[in-house]
Amino acid sequence: MAGGAREVLTLQLGHFAGFVGAHWWNQQDAALCRPTDAKEPPGELCPDVLYRTGRTLHGQETYTPRLILMDLKGSLSSLKQEGGLYRDKQLDAAIAWQGKLTTHKEELYPKNPYLQDLLSAEGVLSSDGTWRVKSIPNGKGLPPFTNAITPKPVMPTEGSIRVWSDFLRVHLHPRSICMIHKYNHDGEAGRLEAFGQGESILKEPKYLEELEDRLHFYVEECDYLQGFQILCDLHDGFSGLGAKAAELLQDEYSGRGIITWGLLPGPYRLGELQKNIYRLLNTAFGLVHLSAHSSLVCPLSLGGSLGLRPEPPVSFPLLQYDATLPFHCGAILATALDTVTVPYRLRSSPVSMVHLADMLNFSGKKVVTAGATIPFPSVPSQSLPDTLMQLGEATPWTPLSACGDPSGTCCFAQSVVLRGLDRAHHTSQLAPGTPLPSPLHACATGEEVLAQYLQQQQPRVRSSSHLLLTPCKVVPPYPSLFSSSLSQHGSVLDGLPTGTAVESIPVLGALCSSSSLNRALGDLAKDLSKLDLRRWASFMDAGVEQDDLEETLQDLRSLAQCYEGGDDRLVD
């Protein structure tokens, strides 16, 4: 049980969602494994919001994500569907058939060297077949990290990572993984590539009952379920599955928050015409249907556009990443997600998912954009007011919702989180009598500094802000993306490169109801209206009718019109 926490159940739907989710859960796990000499005080974030306690059949306590994960056949690599900690009693049921048995064995995937190293560090498989996990402090997380006894971990290489399960370091509950065997992850045939295919999966009693059983298992053990967060691929058939799942949650758990993160890998190439057309159609159908059944929907992508015209991926001054690698893109988006979800994971004075959605989605604006500064440019010799002044009047975060350049747009409401700055740097340290460079330097607390800065940037915007000491953990298997000018804890240093591995970083993240969505959704509708659907009959054959397309197009235009105001190019 969560012991008074406002629990959240996560649904993770799709393969790119798996990459983002694996990094997300690894970061949660790293936050649990706090070093014994950590300077930041524990307890700002409540892990029980996302995790559940349980016991193996041998009585050993476990702490696993409250997660339902759906992916296709071939996506698990060497990870077992029932997980590695313990087996479900149903899975251990005796076989009643006494006749002759024929065994069919599939070729096993070789275990990734990183995961082999992880397992040897966490426990051993004893001679009686029982997995013996090494001692867990306070029943949660892995043993404390100490350099004296812990060998340097094997770092996964980009070449060794084929699927998200190759670098997931978190043990899952047997009820977490639900495989869809009628479609393949690999190969060109049998792919889940259209919205209608995804919708039809949850119309089949087999998969619908399996999802409902898992939902009931997790929900019934919660003391106070605040809602659901859905990590869902938008570009393929999982957009339809996600829409159907959101509809199910809305029907069965009325009044609970449903926040959907629509995930898009990037970039895409002009030469892949059918793939791009399907991506356009799936994204349009997904956004419309997900917004109808969710409290809030946020597209997440490092791409520059939702439409057919490709735009360069976004850039970060202190990161170097390969936008073609899901391993890299997933890490960056997970870091943003770990920051913008802070309000409903706080231990003290949390903002519920429902209240966060209500603050952002007024007047029908259920779609929001995300942005983040990764890492936030903290300099040891500067205070937060100094850093914010240097950012100037430009938008202080990189856009992460494929809505293009935010210049010339306005914000209707926003939720902003800044995490990972030492308290000593929250306010100005100027000597008494020194002229103040800005009103920010007169603020008494870091919370006042951040709130006043946001008010200066967007004077008439409904705004909520949080300032945390807890940084974002970026230890292996998080990829090495950071500038050589960063310290171990993500500060920007002067002089020669340090050569030190970055283990944690400060991050600024935001969710915004932005007029940039007027342009982005409007352009998406224009691209959709220009399609000759006779050329893409295979998409329609998957269960989508012509009337469905016309209705989606109209809904998309109506959704875009909700965001008129402040943009220099509104929808016609």
Curated annotation (Swiss-Prot):
Name of the molecule in the record: Protein misato homolog 1
Entry keyword Membrane: yes
Superkingdom, taxonomy of origin: Eukaryota
Principal localisation: mitochondrion
Similarity comment: family membership: Belongs to the misato family.
Purpose: Involved in the regulation of mitochondrial distribution and morphology. Required for mitochondrial fusion and mitochondrial network formation.
Keyword Membrane in annotation: yes
Cysteine pairings via disulfide bonds: none
UniProt-listed InterPro entries: DML1/Misato, DML1/Misato_tubulin, Misato_II_tubulin-like, Tubulin/FtsZ_GTPase_sf
Biological process per Gene Ontology, one example term: mitochondrion distribution
Entries under PANTHER family matching the protein: MITOCHONDRIAL DISTRIBUTION REGULATOR MISATO (PTHR13391), PROTEIN MISATO HOMOLOG 1 (PTHR13391:SF0)
Keywords: Cytoplasm, Membrane, Mitochondrion, Mitochondrion outer membrane
Pfam families: Misat_Tub_SegII (PF10644), Tubulin_3 (PF14881)
Location within or outside the cell: Mitochondrion outer membrane; Cytoplasm
GO cellular component, one term: cytoplasm
Gene3D superfamilies: Tubulin/FtsZ, GTPase domain (3.40.50.1440)
